[in-house]
Amino acid sequence: MLSFLSARQSGLEDPLRLRRAQSTRRVLGLELNKDRDVERIHGSGVNTLDIEPVEGRYMLSGGSDGVVVLYDLENASRQPHYTCKAVCSVGRSHPDVHKYSVETVQWYPHDTGMFTSSSFDKTLKVWDTNTLQAADVFNFEETVYSHHMSPAATKHCLVAVGTRGPKVQLCDLKSGSCSHILQGHRQEILAVSWSPRHDYILATASADSRVKLWDVRRASGCLLTLDQHNGKKSQAAESANTAHNGKVNGLCFTSDGLHLLTIGTDNRMRLWNSSSGDNTLVNYGKVCNDSRKGLQFAVSCGCSSEFVFVPHGSTIAVYAVHSGERLAMLKGHYKSVDCCVFQPNFQELYSGSRDCNILAWVPPSYEPVPDDDDEAPAKSQLNPAFADAWSSSDEDG
């Protein structure tokens, strides 16, 4: 650390390199924060979490009880032990509450004045954060599994929606209607994700074992169908042009948008080149996944090397994205974890589980440990680097 600081001060190193190195060190030390609680509001499992990208202060959660909760993550009390309080919630008594399980919540990427939620009640709702009223409601014929707004788009306000049907629907927030439909999958759409690098590139994952990349401006179908065999002849004809050997229920782009991570019920996670569609063949080993619906996992941002956080039963597995090495298992929940979200400003992780709890995972604090001996002289508390090195031995000798 001192060498990084010295090199930055003298102009030999890019300041960003020091920041990335420190962020990496903090992520590798993530542990359950025993001094921070998240207020328990949900009466059943927590399915989805999202932290707004503007300040990184407010977090949304959606549960199997249909409730949506907004939390303030900032420690306003300045006390070592504190609870992240729920600012407000769309509870069971709210007139616009979802009737069934909420599967996805997401903040509007550009400010905190609006957020969205989708549910098994076949609706996507757009909320005014200030009034906590539904500003718009999109109704579908099928159960909604997933939705996503582009974090990078500046020329459109499209929300991609995956339902129990095989068609991906694009809803336009400006017009308040479904603008068009993407056809190509054969079964339900379990996960959708816009590229953080390109405005119009969308990835979709389905129970038909396929992952497709789309340019939504094109009318001629998808750009790519990801093939786990990279075009080589497979042993079974039915596995041709499939990303996994089971349902694909999780998608996540890396922060730079150059790669795409997918997870399937075949207990495998794969890393793809998002430009060419090639399987990079990184081996993550067995990644347990028994979820029958979408699984929300997260990728780090701002580190020297990227990390991915994947729900793994009642734990969260931490992998190095490009090497496949499993670095840690975060243990704290009592039941299966269904979602996690990364907070890049402070390198923190939040996870939601079927045990109804939301847990905070934070880097370790490196505060000095006080000396147990109260009678020890004050100079023993000094850092040796700052101690006086003068000695009278020369005069005595």
Swiss-Prot record:
Modified residues (Phosphoserine): 391-393
Domain of life where this protein originates: Eukaryota
GO molecular function per UniProt: ubiquitin-like ligase-substrate adaptor activity
Biological process per Gene Ontology, one example term: response to oxidative stress
Inactivation phenotype: Ercc8 deficient mice develop normally, but show a loss of retinal photoreceptors after 4 months of age, and enhanced UV-sensitivity.
Any one cellular-component term (Gene Ontology): nucleus
SUPFAM superfamilies reported in the protein's UniProt record: WD40 repeat-like
UniProtKB keywords: Chromosome, DNA damage, DNA repair, Nucleus, Phosphoprotein, Repeat, Ubl conjugation pathway, WD repeat
Protein's cellular compartments: Nucleus; Chromosome; Nucleus matrix
UniProt-listed Pfam families: WD40 (PF00400)
Presence of the UniProt keyword Cytoplasm in the record: no
WD repeat residue intervals: 41-81, 97-137, 184-224, 243-282, 332-371
Protein's name in the database: DNA excision repair protein ERCC-8
PANTHER family xrefs: DNA EXCISION REPAIR PROTEIN ERCC-8
Pathway entry: Protein modification; protein ubiquitination
Function description: Substrate-recognition component of the CSA complex, a DCX (DDB1-CUL4-X-box) E3 ubiquitin-protein ligase complex, involved in transcription-coupled nucleotide excision repair (TC-NER), a process during which RNA polymerase II-blocking lesions are rapidly removed from the transcribed strand of active genes. Following recruitment to lesion-stalled RNA polymerase II (Pol II), the CSA complex mediates ubiquitination of Pol II subunit POLR2A/RPB1 at 'Lys-1268', a critical TC-NER checkpoint, governing RNA Pol II stability and initiating DNA damage excision by TFIIH recruitment.
The keyword Nucleus belongs to this UniProt entry's keyword annotation: yes
Subunit composition and interactions: Part of the CSA complex (also named DCX(ERCC8) complex), a DCX E3 ubiquitin-protein ligase complex containing ERCC8, RBX1, DDB1 and CUL4A; the CSA complex interacts with RNA polymerase II; upon UV irradiation it interacts with the COP9 signalosome and preferentially with the hyperphosphorylated form of RNA polymerase II. Interacts with ERCC6/CSB (via CIM motif); promoting recruitment to lesion-stalled RNA polymerase II (Pol II). Interacts with KIAA1530/UVSSA. Interacts with a subunit of RNA polymerase II TFIIH.
SMART domains xrefs: WD40 (SM00320)
